Curated annotation (Swiss-Prot):
It is a multi-pass membrane protein. Belongs to the BI1 family. Keywords: Cell membrane, Membrane, Transmembrane, Transmembrane helix. The lineage of its organism: Bacteria, Pseudomonadati, Chlamydiota, Chlamydiia, Chlamydiales. PANTHER family: BAX INHIBITOR-RELATED, PROTEIN LIFEGUARD 4. Disulfide bonds: none annotated. This is Uncharacterized protein TC_0206. It is found in: Cell membrane. InterPro entries: Bax_inhibitor_1-related.
C-alpha cells in the first residue's frame, strides 16, 4: 500500500496547518531557487556554468525520483534536505538560462513570464482548492498527457538537431503549459482533501506536506518556464 493510499479518515484535525505547511515549503523552495539564480547572476558565474545546464536538469530529475521512491524510508530532516537541494539545483538551471533570455529578449520578458506565472498559478490553485468537482479522473488523464509530453519533447530534441521546427516547439510549450496548469488545479484539490483527513500524524503528515510542496513547486516552476518559452517565441516572430 502506497503512502497516498492509506486511510487517513480517522483524524481531521488541523487541516489549515497541513495546507500552510505545503505552501510554506513551496514558497521556501522558490525563494532558495531565486536566491541561487540571483547569486549566479550577480557573480557572473552563469557564464561559466551555462554549458552544464543539462547536468542541473538530470540532477533535479534524479533527486525528485529518489524522494518519490524512498519517501517512506527517509527521515523528515532528510526529505527537507533533499527538497532544499532540489531547489538549489533548479536555481542552478534557471540561474544559467534566464540571463541568456534576458540578454537576448530583454529583462521585461522574464518579469512578464514571472508575473503571468504567479497569476495563473494562484488562480489555478484557488480553483482547485474550492471547486466541488471530483478531479481524480482528470488527474489520471493529465499524468498520461505528461508522459506523452516527455516522449514528444525527447523526440523533438532529436529531430531539431537536424532541422529547426519552431512551430512544433511552440505547440509543445502550449501543451506543457496546459498540462501543468491542470496539475496545479488537481494537486490543490489533493492538498485540501489530504489536509482534511490526515490531521497531524507526526512524520507521516510532514512527509506528505513536503511531497505536495514539491509537486506544487514543480507546477509553478514549469508554468513559468513554458511561459518564458512562449513569450520568447512570440518576440522572435515580430
Amino acid at each position: 500500500m502506497g503512502l497516498y493510499d492509506r486511510d487517513y479518515t480517522q483524524d481531521s484535525r488541523l487541516p489549515g496547518t497541513f495546507s500552510s505547511r505545503v505552501y510554506g515549503w513551496m514558497t521556501a523552495g522558490l525563494a532558495v531557487t531565486a536566491l541561487t539564480s540571483l547569486g549566479l547572476y550577480a557573480t557572473g558565474a552563469y557564464r561559466t556554468l551555462f554549458s552544464l545546464w543539462w547536468v542541473w536538469c538530470f540532477a533535479t530529475l534524479g533527486v525528485s525520483f529518489y524522494i518519490q521512491a524512498q519517501i517512506q524510508k527517509l527521515s523528515v530532516p532528510a526529505v527537507m534536505g533533499l527538497f532544499l537541494a532540489y531547489s538549489v539545483l533548479e536555481g542552478m538551471f534557471f540561474g544559467t538560462m534566464v540571463p541568456v533570455y534576458a540578454a537576448q529578449f530583454g529583462g521585461g520578458i522574464v518579469w512578464a513570464a514571472f508575473g503571468s506565472a504567479a497569476v495563473i498559478f494562484g488562480l489555478s490553485a484557488a480553483y482547485g482548492a474550492f471547486t466541488k468537482s471530483d478531479l481524480t479522473q482528470i488527474h489520471r488523464i493529465l499524468m498520461l498527457a505528461l508522459i506523452g509530453l516527455m516522449v514528444i519533447s525527447l523526440g523533438f530534441l532529436v529531430v531539431s538537431l537536424f532541422t529547426p521546427m519552431p512551430l512544433m516547439y511552440l505547440l509543445i510549450c502550449y501543451l506543457g503549459l496546459i498540462i501543468f496548469v491542470g496539475l496545479t488545479v488537481v494537486d490543490a484539490q489533493s492538498i485540501r482533501r489530504v489536509a482534511r483527513s490526515v490531521g497531524d500524524h507526526g512524520d507521516l503528515s510532514y512527509k506528505l506536506s513536503l511531497i505536495m510542496a514539491l509537486q506544487m513547486y514543480c507546477n509553478v516552476i514549469m508554468i513559468f518556464w513554458y511561459l518564458l518559452q512562449i513569450f520568447a517565441s512570440s518576440d522572435k516572430r515580430r
